[in-house]
Amino acid sequence: MGCFSSKELQQSKRTILEKPLVDITKIYILGEELGRGNFGLTRKCVEKSTGKTFACKTILKTKLKDEECEEDVKREIRIMKQLSGEPNIVEFKNAYEDKDSVHIVMEYCGGGELYDKILALYDVGKSYSEKEAAGIIRSIVNVVKNCHYMGVMHRDLKPENFLLTSNDDNATVKVIDFGCSVFIEEGKVYQDLAGSDYYIAPEVLQGNYGKEADIWSAGIILYILLCGKSPFVKEPEGQMFNEIKSLEIDYSEEPWPLRDSRAIHLVKRMLDRNPKERISAAEVLGHPWMKEGEASDKPIDGVVLSRLKRFRDANKFKKVVLKFIAANLSEEEIKGLKTLFTNIDTDKSGNITLEELKTGLTRLGSNLSKTEVEQLMEAADMDGNGTIDIDEFISATMHRYKLDRDEHVYKAFQHFDKDNDGHITKEELEMAMKEDGAGDEGSIKQIIADADTDNDGKINFEEFRTMMRTESSLQPEGELLPIIN
């Protein structure tokens, strides 16, 4: 939701929802964890009186740092109530509050994420066609249309926020998260940064936007569904946001010549950089390619599905390498990072909260915005518990600075170059990825292809070093922390 973290709001006597406190465990049996974020976690739960299964999103009060954040929670609940019952939108059940948390109980969607459904077709060798893509985007744009009609701008449309109601072939796609959503105020120009990389609209980056930004995000999803990758690249650092604002998308490259011209026309209309000229949700649903039965059921080349799989596996090898480097830093090298961690962790809890990170960075001379610090927090918080521990801190700071030292990168290269022949081969890369439970053959081939500038089918040290020093634009630009030598 963008504004959770800190210990400032301890268990308050007044209630956030302005109704009596309730022990949720007397109403529901809380079960397995479904997901975790900076604000808390979502669990499967069973209603004791009926035996029905729901999902329970628990927001810890200690993560709400001010009244603005409390208002964000109340707004999310109001929006879910207002939209409940609309097609393709998760059903709101109820909201409760106890002394520690706010609990939002909603419909349980047991079919997994949207991309998982598509990739399952790839895994079992089934076909995937424009017809499937049109059906998926129809559900997504139907959400946008209903949100806008009901006076809500979603602001964070991405595949991860869409789940399937079941594992059945005819399962319904539903949007589940309204943490970034706002009520649309007539004539208001929105300026705050909201959304996710890849899917964020250019006008959002420019700080001047309205509900049309949701159509752009849906258009990016459609683009990816039809070609298997994003139109924008994250590397080198900062390039993606610049491309979102200005890059002319090339539809002459494969596989676009194989796509229906009407599909391409729709993507172009949804990705018009002028929000005033961009197609509306109702117009998308009425587009010739989108009409029921119009999109081709001819199987799309398997390369698109394999690209989708690689798109999800992006940067996994880098994470494997970073984990190795962090684990092998000497005590002397870690000493400086530990000192910095201790200075920022002012309450000496062993964990850095968002508020401590903001205060610490300001004290160190950083002028990052609130959103940029939140992005940094999210990137460093690997286990998603809302705080940064010492290991996460070392990995995050080492990621940006220790990679400038050849000895660290070379030591990692040697670790993955099992036969010490000066190259990381496909087999060696496969071994490294499988040890970490990441990557398939297509992803591994793509990692090599992306890094292998001399096209010999292997990764030498120079290529490895270049790959590891190429940053992701997920991190805010500029120096975040002082360099530790």
Swiss-Prot record:
Catalytic residue list: 156
What region holds the Protein kinase domain? 28-290
Residues engaged in binding Ca(2+) 1: 345, 347, 349, 351, 356
The record's section on PROSITE patterns has:
EF_HAND_1, EF_HAND_2, PROTEIN_KINASE_ATP, PROTEIN_KINASE_DOM, PROTEIN_KINASE_ST
Q: What residues bind Ca(2+) 3, as annotated?
A: 417, 419, 421, 423, 428
Gene Ontology cellular-component terms listed: plasma membrane
Q: How is its activity regulated?
A: Activated by calcium. Autophosphorylation may play an important role in the regulation of the kinase activity.
Modification Phosphoserine occurs at? 196
Compartment list: Membrane
Where along this sequence does the record place binding of Ca(2+) 2?
381, 383, 385, 387, 392
Its predominant location is membrane
How the protein sits in the membrane? Lipid-anchor
Q: What is its EC number?
A: 2.7.11.1
What molecular function does GO assign, one term? ATP binding
The family database entries (InterPro entries) matched by this protein are listed as: CDPK_Ser/Thr_kinases (IPR050205), EF-hand-dom_pair (IPR011992), EF_Hand_1_Ca_BS (IPR018247), EF_hand_dom (IPR002048), Kinase-like_dom_sf (IPR011009), Prot_kinase_dom (IPR000719), Protein_kinase_ATP_BS (IPR017441), Ser/Thr_kinase_AS (IPR008271)
Question: Which residues take part in binding ATP?
Answer: 34-42, 57
What Pfam families is this protein classified in?
EF-hand_7, Pkinase
Coiled-coil segments, which residues?
A: none
Task: Give the catalytic activity.
Answer: L-seryl-[protein] + ATP = O-phospho-L-seryl-[protein] + ADP + H(+); L-threonyl-[protein] + ATP = O-phospho-L-threonyl-[protein] + ADP + H(+)
Q: Where does Ca(2+) 4 bind?
A: 452, 454, 456, 458, 463
Q: List the N-myristoyl glycine lipid attachment residues.
A: 2
Q: What does this protein do?
A: May play a role in signal transduction pathways that involve calcium as a second messenger.
Name the family.
Belongs to the protein kinase superfamily. Ser/Thr protein kinase family. CDPK subfamily.
Domain characteristics, as noted in the entry: There are 3 contiguous domains conserved in the CDPK subfamily: a kinase domain, an autoinhibitory (junction) domain and a calmodulin-like domain. The autoinhibitory domain (295-325) inactivates kinase activity under calcium-free conditions.
Q: What is the recorded name of this protein?
A: Calcium-dependent protein kinase 27
- Gene name for this UniProt entry: CPK27
